[in-house]
Amino acid sequence: MNLWDKKAKTYARYQNTLNTIQKQTFEYLQNLNISFQNKSIIDIGCGTGVWTLHLAKEAKEILALDSANAMLEILQEDAKKLNLNNIKCENLSFETWMQNNPNTKFDLAFLSMSPALQNEKDYTNFLNLAKIKIYLGWADYRKSDFLDPIFKYFNTEFKGFYKKDLENYLLEKNIFFHKIVFDETRKVQRTKEEAI
């Protein structure tokens, strides 16, 4: 069982009401005239379907790709409750899926808060999947009342997941992109047992 399978039990699930980031994202995409209506979409690192299920309400078809089977089981359970039957789930890493499907194309490639893109090959594959690409990632700093004192004590900082990230790759390759930074605050409290 991989780490993400373990996280599935407590991972955020689909909510019919859009959260703050989803509202801001869909408004921003609408201002860019990006539509999901009748599109073929791949959602890379889809997790439990927090975004997938909203996209599926408009999409012609959507491929939900994730390396954690437990996440996909939750997505399928919620899709069934919503009577959405245009979602196909595949339990593979992005790298393996690309090796198996090197020539597959979609109208839109979507990736949200997923560590699926690890290197330049992944970035290139993502960019070649579709005409429209949407990538939502962590900007950088994440505050933690638990971790911040530890970082301070050891005179270090949170390194982030993407110090060499897609944005730098796009800049290096002189590829045009739109960028917006959303500000979100989440408060998560865990028991001592959950934190360990």
Which residues make up each language-model segment?
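Conserved class I S-adenosyl-L-methionine
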Residues: 1-35, 38-47
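Class I SAM-dependent methyltransferase SAM/SAH-binding core
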Residues: 50-85, 90-96
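Short conserved loop adjoining the S-adenosyl-L-methionine
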Residues: 96-103
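A short, conserved alpha-helix within the catalytic core of class I
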Residues: 116-129
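Conserved beta-strand signature within the Rossmann-like core of class I S-adenosyl-L-methionine
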Residues: 131-142
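Conserved Class I S-adenosyl-L-methionine
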Residues: 149-164
